[in-house]
Amino acid sequence: MTDLHIPAMPIRVSEARGGDSLSGNLDDTVFNRLLKERIIFLGSEVTDQVANRICAQLLLLAAEDPDRDINLYINSPGGSVYSGMAIYDTMQYITNDVATIAMGMAASMGQLLLCAGAPGKRYALPHARIMMHQPSGGMGGTASDIAIQAEQMLYTKRMFQERVAFHTGQDSAQIEADSDRDRWFTAAEGLDYGFIDRVITGATQVPTGAGTRN
């Protein structure tokens, strides 16, 4: 779910799993090894902490080699719009092609990041599910505060729809209608809609060469 707010205190991986620091160290080892292969993994809700890590990894890999592709694997239920847009903007900012691969679930903000991958390099595994809906968030305070929050909500909704329309080739009116409520897509349906360019079954189907953007 794409929210306008995030929890004040994100739960650490080891705490969420009921483990100890050893599990956290193992996760770090795996993710660092993947990073050496130019693979970034988004496998959780999109929070400030997660977005800062992914943005830093994108910038690091771009600095190491501004031409080689970066592979972003996505298994996410969504999260904060603002945190997600930081990742989105960084993907567009660097010169590298960022290939996106959906596995499990790419929902809400995860869906936007999936379709924002480099043209021709947006993929999904056969049983991945893609979900699109409009941003949501709570409102409170005085009448003036609520009016300001409502205006911001409408701006965010329009921006989100315009970005999805741009990357899928659908028009904004169609995106608005289709995202009014949760809409789920299979990988094949996501291909037809324009979220992805190909349904893949093996890692060899994801190219690892130089990017094509100018």
PLM ranges: what are they?
Residues 1-109, 115-214:
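N-terminal organellar transit peptides
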